[in-house]
Structures are given as structure tokens and as C-alpha cells.
Amino acid sequence: VSRAKIGTQEVNALAAADALMALAGHRRQQVWEASAIKPAPALLKSVPTRERPLFLPDTPEGENILFDYKATGLTLRRHPLALLRERLATRGLLSSEQLNALPDGQDVSGCGIVTLRQQPQTAKGTIFVTIEDETGPVNVIVWKSLRETQRAEVLHARLLAVHGTWQRSEENGTAKGYGAVRNLVARRLEDLTPLLGRLGTSSRDFH
């Protein structure tokens, strides 16, 4: 790091993003050692330090995922909903994988992090929302009437539970599961964002 002449601010940002693992180990250790870096006067740069190193315990997985999103907006670790799956299952909320195995017309409930909101000009007030969990995305259709009664959930929820009807149609001439159109048509929405704790996520919104 010193050879590359990287500034203190950049070193701290790299440590927060868990990018210095090869130099300092796990993230908590990286952040600790990065915070200890202070510019030294030219005369003292060659003077060795005699401080005994302090070794910190590793960060729990959930906290690491939280810091990943805070530092970079994404994570290469497990999806946040993998950590919440048991709690979501007790609420009767199915995963994307489970939904995709269901037949057309079934009443279902699913949940995911909102990654996209679209409101095309030709949709007459309908909003298309994409939610995502650890097994994949789910396309959600929110009709204008529901949007008007649950506007806060539609526009502001980061973790959204959707209760509605599973819509699935197979294209002619395609193998089952291929070329299928799958949507969850919302009947009721539930904002479960508090379950994410301090996790910062954002969606791409298009109008």
C-alpha cells in the first residue's frame, strides 16, 4: 500500500469493501489496520514501529453482508434473504424457485428485495415490480387500483411480500418450463423492510 502511494481515504475505502484480505485478513482486521495508518514525516518513514499487533475476531456473516452493501452496493457472499429464509417460510412466503414450480392460477405469497420498478406510459397506471431472493427474480404485476390503496408499499418498500395469484403460460411448441411467461399478480402487499435491519439496498426505478 505504501509503495503504491495510496492515500489514507482510499485505504479505508478498500478495507471497508473487504479488498485488502491478502494483506490483512478478514474485514474487521483490515478496517482496524487501515485506521492505524497515519502519514509520517519524511525523517521517520524509515523508523520501524514496535507496537504489538492486535488481532480481532472475524465479523459475523450477516454483518459482512451488511458492510458489503454499504461499501459497494452488492455482495458476493450469500444473498441476504438466504439468512432470512427460515423466518420468511414461517410466514408462508415462498422462494422464487418454489413459485416457478407451481401451476397457473394458484394463490401464493412470495417475498424479495425490490430491484426494479417500471411504470410504462402505456400501462395505464399499472406498475411492474421485480423482486429477487437467493434463488432468482420474480416479476410482479401491480394493478392501478392496488397501487392507489398501497402506494407506500409499492413505491418505498425495499423488502416486499406479495400475496396474489401465480400466472403462468407456456408458449406453444416449447418444452415445459422454457419460453414460459411467469408473473405474480398482486392482490395485497406487505412491507417487510424492517427484517433487513441496517442493510442498504436500492432499486432501479423507471417511469
Where are these regions (language model features)?
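Hydrophobic, well-ordered secondary-structure elements that form the walls
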Residues: 72, 112, 131, 157, ...
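Short, surface-exposed secondary-structure edge patches
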Residues: 99, 105-106, 149-154
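Short glycine/proline-enriched turns and hinge-like loops at secondary-structure junctions
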Residues: 106, 121-126, 153, 177-178
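Hydrophobic core residues within well-ordered beta-strands of beta-rich domains
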Residues: 108-110, 127, 160
